[in-house]
């Protein structure tokens, strides 16, 4: 009777998972032509159903059969039974690269199919022994085994033996019914194999390096290798430690020989070697050693200790958590561990430890290219690094006092945290499952091509999303994605099911981080789940302290108060406080932030719906926490107007209001409070407070830029002053009993107000001018103008309301404080024509129309100001010297007592005054000829000076940078402290500097970095000022910039000096009297 002929139907092939049916039939026909029995072909078809990529597995299997027949090897010996066939086919279905290796290396086929020596069951010692024997070294030598083969032969044997064991591990992994359950075992076996390979490479290095017998050498594994959770293909993080093997070895020789040994072992592992056909194993990364890649390759133990005592950054102690001796001298390795463990377990007490580690994690996330953010299994949000980070932070915070937590492996540590009561059992199980699932995905992606990767398959347009927003998924496209299909089959899932599971896992990991680290910080009555753990008092204090709270006991009391009771506010707080605590911890002053959060709830929690809004708007809640923990001024402001919180949820609400919108509001107030100065003043000042608050919130939230915030605040001042002047004019028309105003009155903005550079703590510098109406006499016009100004000042800064004053500073008027508050146009014309000094001409560069009679302002600016500020003749040398002397005197007189020159943002070396006086001097020199220079703003004028080649691009950059940074620092200082009188002074303490630095884009607790950067910019600016303003040469400017402050400025002052723009008019009057 004829035996049955193997001829699979299309349905048979489809059931086996094959997709290219024509190619599959052709390959089976080829096997039959090669005399492969039908029974074996049927077994092969059955085995393909278990392969992740049946088509590639079949293709590689046929190629292997052809290669073995060409070399006349017995296929039945290599693949003796159906189990061996299944193991081989499964490996070919998960690793195309291994399949291609097997064509030329039959020993790999045997290792994967039968593994006669059961290498997949080897323990650490057995793997070490196998690889040491491969290089001809004695495995019984514990500290210094030496290879006996030459370099090429030993490296070939080492790499070949490594890959044989790797093939057996892949087979063990691939055939597992549940790859997630076996993942920890696989990672440990891969780590043991890497340890053994390093031991073998070190033995080769000893053989190749003269004098190696005098050097004790140990290899410290870091990262995944140190934690025994290595991937299939990964950089191996290593640190090398050396010590002399005998007393006769000097330090220089020790380091020289040790460096040669380290270089050679790295070459064996990662480089091409003449005469070695086997490919390298993996790359070695020495970036975690002291000083990173710039540091010495090898160091003695004491050098390591000195570095960690004096120079190491916080993240380096976190990295040391996973350190483990993996090869070399075991006693020296243990000595390294004994030396570093105290550093690791005291790290959480280091300043800003958790914050710095969090920022490092955030920085890694931010560096991921946008198209890859949702494909990053390892580094992305909700990825493996998030799990590891959560576990490590808990270990480092609580392991200081709980020695049971002192482990390096992520899953082992998670189990210890659960047993210790720091993580609930349910949370530990969920996080363990998530971690193992993501790690298996990473492994399978690496196995396929045996290349380093940790990316989820490319889904095209569906690659973006999965966390905050849904993916744009087409199921048909997913099913056609071969890479996704192969990965999904590893878990027994359909492609769309794998995508859903991946996204669900990432979301759960992010949620668990909050639940595990922050929710236990809430009291027992605030827990949301039955099995939620409750920290002991000591553990809670450690947890609060670790995220930056300076007074953890007070923080605990605040949280208890916020979550107590059955009210709506308490219920919402129980939901959102874990996230709130995390966000507050990212600020410079978490204690202030939590206190402000509690004040908001006490003031408005029962009446306002703001907490419900924050629960529903994550972005608004996060912005609010950033503001409360970084701004005393805005925290106080929000406690007066809680409705402002709603702006944080919509960027449109945070945009600065246009002048037209401001005028509509002031017009409404004019109509409503036209007869009541108190109510009108209250409305104007409240409007100013409200709008400055909006601008501050917007600036802190990154919605508007630095320059836009200055212009927006200027618009607020213009609108309010214009409305206030209108109210005063109307009121005095009624008081005088006339139908029309006897005089037109205008407000000329001066100083930074004139330059549209109003900051959060600015006064409004101005000049007030009136001109009699055609039918009015001078006396009546003067009396009317004085009364109007009296009303105007009462509205803005009088004691008519409890709202903060709007300071209208009139000291820049003719004759300063001794001159009349409001002056007639004719008097101004006479004064400026006859008595104006050089500094007054310079001050007029900022003059612009702000409010009131626009025609009067135009006449003043064109007929009086322009000829003085835009002269057609050059400044004389005497005028130049006068300006320079006046600047020096002004800074010396106005600098507050005890403040060093380099720390005053306005008057200090390289501060605002240097930039503004330099720019204004050049305007006085050139604006008569260059109309584009006739602008009021500092940066506008600087741009023109650069464009017209009157100043070099390099100098312009330095001046612009200094002005921008100093202006932002002044604003930041005011918002941080709420103290206007300190806004110009750069504080000495690093903590306050850190509060200001946040506003300039630095992270919290970066005060030292900010100070160094700012002072460097100011020094460069001062150098430019010395050349352009004082006329010094480059050498003279450099010397002056680095010189110490003069003795005069260092002498203690007995009393504060008056402002220079007040002194200058007085000096001018004295000069005139002397002339008369």
UniProtKB/Swiss-Prot annotation:
* Name of encoding gene: glnE
Q: Which top EC class applies here?
A: transferase
GO MF annotation: an example: magnesium ion binding
Q: Under which name does UniProt file this protein?
A: Bifunctional glutamine synthetase adenylyltransferase/adenylyl-removing enzyme
The record's region (Disordered) falls at 1042-1076
Region of interest (Adenylyl transferase), residue spans: 524-1076
- Provide the family line: Belongs to the GlnE family.
Q: Which InterPro entries match?
A: GlnE, GlnE_rpt_dom, NT_sf, PII_UdlTrfase/GS_AdlTrfase
User: ATP-binding as a keyword?
Assistant: yes
Q: According to the UniProt entry, what is the EC number of this protein?
A: 2.7.7.89, 2.7.7.42
Cofactor(s) annotated in UniProt: Mg(2+)
């Amino acid at each position: 009777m004829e035996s049955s002929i193997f001829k699979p139907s299309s349905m048979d092939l489809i059931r086996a998972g094959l997709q290219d049916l024509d190619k599959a039939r052709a390959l089976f026909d080829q096997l039959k032509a090669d005399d492969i029995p039908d029974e074996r072909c049927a077994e092969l078809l059955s085995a393909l159903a278990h392969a992740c990529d049946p088509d590639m597995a079949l293709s590689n299997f046929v190629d292997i059969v052809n290669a073995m027949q060409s070399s006349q090897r017995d296929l039945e010996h290599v693949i003796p039974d159906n189990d061996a066939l299944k193991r081989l086919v499964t490996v070919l279905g998960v690793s195309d690269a291994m399949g291609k290796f097997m064509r030329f290396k039959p020993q790999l086929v045997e290792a994967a199919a039968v593994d006669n020596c059961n290498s997949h069951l080897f323990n650490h010692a057995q793997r070490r022994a196998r690889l040491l024997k491969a290089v001809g070294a004695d495995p019984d030598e514990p500290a210094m085994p030496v290879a006996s083969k030459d370099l090429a032969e030993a490296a070939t044997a080492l790499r070949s033996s490594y890959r044989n064991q790797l093939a057996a591990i892949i087979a063990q992994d691939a055939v597992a019914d549940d790859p997630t359950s076996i993942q920890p075992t696989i990672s440990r076996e891969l780590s043991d194999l890497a340890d053994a390979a390093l031991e073998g490479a070190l033995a080769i290095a000893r053989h190749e390096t003269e004098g190696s017998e005098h050097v004790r050498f140990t290899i410290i594994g870091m990262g995944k290798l140190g934690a025994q959770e290595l991937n299939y293909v990964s950089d191996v993080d290593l640190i090398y430690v050396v010590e002399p093997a005998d007393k006769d070895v000097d330090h220089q020789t020790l380091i020289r020989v040790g460096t040669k040994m380290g270089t050679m072992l790295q070459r064996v592992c990662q480089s091409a070697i003449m005469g070695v056909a086997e490919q390298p194993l993996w790359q070695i990364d020495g970036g975690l050693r002291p000083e990173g890649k710039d540091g010495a390759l090898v160091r003695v133990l004491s050098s390591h200790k000195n570095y960690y005592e004096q120079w190491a950054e916080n993240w380096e102690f976190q990295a040391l958590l996973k350190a483990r001796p993996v090869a070399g001298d075991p006693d020296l390795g243990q000595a390294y561990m004994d030396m570093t463990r105290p550093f690791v377990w005291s790290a959480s007490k280091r300043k800003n430890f958790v914050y710095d580690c969090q920022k490092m994690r955030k920085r890694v996330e931010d560096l991921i290219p946008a198209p890859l953010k949702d494909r990053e299994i390892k580094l992305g949000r909700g990825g493996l690094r998030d799990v590891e980070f959560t576990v490590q932070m808990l270990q480092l915070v609580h392991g200081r006092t709980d020695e049971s937590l002192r482990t390096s492996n992520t899953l082992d540590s998670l189990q210890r945290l659960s047993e210790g009561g720091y993580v609930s059992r349910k949370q530990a199980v969920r996080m363990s499952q998530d971690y193992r699932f993501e790690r298996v995905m990473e492994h399978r992606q690496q196995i396929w091509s045996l290349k380093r990767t940790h990316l989820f398959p490319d889904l095209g347009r569906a690659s973006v999303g999965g966390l905050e927003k849904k993916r744009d998924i087409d199921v048909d496209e997913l099913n056609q994605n071969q890479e996704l299909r192969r990965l999904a089959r590893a878990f027994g899932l359909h492609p769309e099911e794998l995508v859903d599971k991946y996204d669900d896992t990432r979301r759960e990991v992010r949620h668990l981080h909050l639940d595990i680290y922050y929710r236990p910080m809430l009291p027992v009555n605030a827990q949301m789940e039955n099995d939620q753990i409750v920290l002991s008092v000591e553990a809670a204090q450690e947890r609060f302290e670790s995220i930056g709270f300076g007074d953890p006991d007070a923080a605990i009391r605040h949280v208890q108060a916020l979550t107590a009771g059955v009210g709506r506010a308490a219920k919402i707080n129980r939901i959102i406080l874990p996230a709130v605590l995390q966000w507050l911890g990212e600020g410079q002053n978490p204690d202030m932030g939590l206190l402000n959060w509690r004040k908001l709830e006490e003031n408005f929690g029962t009446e306002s719906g703001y907490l419900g809004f924050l629960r529903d708007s994550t972005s608004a809640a996060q912005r609010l926490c950033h503001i409360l923990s970084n701004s005393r001024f805005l925290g106080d402001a929000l406690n007066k107007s809680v409705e402002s919180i709603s702006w944080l949820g919509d960027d449109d609400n945070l945009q600065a209001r246009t002048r037209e919108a401001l005028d509509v509001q002031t017009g409404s107030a004019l109509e409503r409070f036209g007869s009541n100065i108190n109510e009108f003043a209250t409305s104007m000042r409240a409007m100013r407070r409200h709008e400055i608050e909006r601008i501050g919130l917007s600036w802190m939230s990154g919605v508007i830029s630095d320059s836009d915030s200055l212009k927006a605040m200027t618009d607020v001042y213009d609108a309010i002053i214009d409305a206030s002047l209108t109210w005063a004019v109307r009121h005095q028309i009624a008081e005088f009993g006339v139908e029309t105003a006897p005089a037109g009155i205008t407000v000329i903005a001066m100083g930074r107000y004139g330059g549209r550079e109003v900051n959060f703590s600015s006064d409004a510098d101005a000049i007030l001018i009136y001109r009699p109406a055609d039918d009015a006499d001078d006396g009546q016009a003067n009396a009317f103008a004085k009364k109007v100004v009296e009303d105007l000042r009462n509205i803005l800064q009088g004691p008519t309301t409890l709202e903060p004053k709007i300071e209208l500073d009139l000291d820049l008027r003719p004759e300063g404080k001794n001159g009349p508050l409001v002056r007639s146009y004719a008097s101004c014309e006479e004064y400026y024509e006859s008595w104006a000094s050089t500094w007054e001409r310079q001050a007029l560069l900022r003059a612009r129309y702000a409010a009131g009679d626009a025609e009067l302002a135009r006449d003043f600016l064109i007929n009086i100001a322009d000829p003085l500020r835009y002269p057609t003749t050059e400044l004389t040398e005497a005028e130049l010297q006068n300006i320079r002397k006046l600047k020096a005197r002004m800074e010396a007189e106005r600098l507050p007592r005890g403040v060093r020159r380099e720390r005053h943002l306005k008057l200090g070396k390289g501060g605002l005054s240097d930039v503004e006086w330099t720019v204004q001097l050049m305007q006085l020199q050139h604006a008569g000829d260059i109309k584009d220079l006739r602008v009021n703003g500092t940066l506008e004028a600087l741009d023109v000076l650069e464009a017209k080649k009157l100043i070099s691009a390099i100098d312009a950059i330095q001046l612009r940078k200094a002005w921008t940074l100093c202006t932002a620092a002044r604003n930041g200082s005011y918002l941080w402290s709420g103290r206007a009188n300190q806004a110009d002074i750069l504080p000495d303490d690093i903590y306050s500097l850190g509060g200001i630095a946040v506003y300039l884009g630095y992270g919290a607790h970066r005060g030292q970095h900010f100070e160094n950067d700012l002072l460097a910019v100011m020094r460069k600016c001062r150098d430019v000022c010395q050349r352009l303003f004082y006329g010094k040469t480059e050498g003279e400017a450099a010397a002056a910039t680095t010189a110490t402050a003069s003795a005069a400025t260092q002498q203690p002052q007995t009393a504060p000096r008056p402002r220079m723009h007040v002194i200058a008019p007085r000096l001018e009057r004295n000069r005139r009297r002397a002339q008369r």
